[in-house]
Regions:
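Conserved double-stranded beta-helix
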Residues: 1-40, 44-46
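Short, surface-exposed loop/helix-turn segments at secondary-structure junctions
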Residues: 5-8, 77-86, 119, 138-143
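Glycine-rich, charged/polar anion/phosphate-binding loops
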Residues: 7-10, 24-25, 87-89, 107-110
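Short, function-defining helix-loop hinge/capping sites that tune catalysis or transport
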Residues: 14-16, 36, 49, 112-114, ...
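A structural signal for well-ordered alpha-helical scaffolds and beta->alpha junctions
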Residues: 17-20, 55, 72, 120
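Non-heme Fe(II)/2-oxoglutarate
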Residues: 54-57, 97-102, 106-184
């Protein structure tokens, strides 16, 4: 989907930090005609943003909600300025079906416009170690302490343990129950 350049960390914040990876698997061939993933190479190596100073600037002494549009925009704008000052430019990533892109939590990335009628189907996941607590903006900006352990239960598939969430949700306006995935 078309998305402005961003880092996932404000809405996918782990403690200790950066203990996850983004994984994007192409189901269709993707080029400039159907909205490729855009990445800013080396943006994950930039110095950290002072999120406490940013919190004071955006929220003052007020509360920070788990999904704050103001907190999201302020952070992403700060990262964009850092990338520009460092001379880093976004690059489109063209892929074939089955190609997998794995990225660091601090990599600035987004989805380019999709000008054609063609599809750009993909599967996107964020993967953490087992029991890794994940917080949102209230944790990212330091208002809410990070949980010591993730609250979800796991089920076993062979030697793997998979978190049981029950719904697909990443702070979007919608959630989707996962029972329909089991019918296939």
């Amino acid at each position: 989907s078309e998305q402005s350049l961003h880092r996932d960390t404000p809405v996918f914040c782990t403690s200790p930090g950066d203990r996850y990876m983004g994984v994007w698997t192409a189901l269709d061939a993707v080029d400039d005609s159907n909205g490729p993933l855009r990445v800013v190479p080396r943006s994950h190596l930039l110095p950290p943003i002072d999120v406490q100073a940013l919190r004071r600037k955006v929220f003052g002494d007020g509360p920070v909600s788990a999904m704050s549009p103001e907190g999201w925009t302020a952070y992403q704008d700060a990262v964009a300025r850092q990338c520009e000052e460092a001379g880093l430019q976004p690059q489109a990533v063209h892929v074939q079906p089955g190609d997998v892109i794995v990225w660091h939590p601090q990599l600035f990335h987004g989805g380019a416009p999709h000008p054609s009628a063609g599809t750009r189907r993909s599967v996107v996941m964020h993967v953490t170690p087992k029991s890794m607590p994940v917080g949102h903006m209230d944790v990212f900006y330091g208002q809410t302490p990070s949980a010591e352990k993730a609250p979800w239960r796991y089920y076993r598939r062979g030697r793997r343990e998979i978190a049981r969430f029950g719904q697909v949700d990443f702070g979007h306006e919608y959630t989707r129950r996962t029972w329909f995935l089991r019918k296939a």
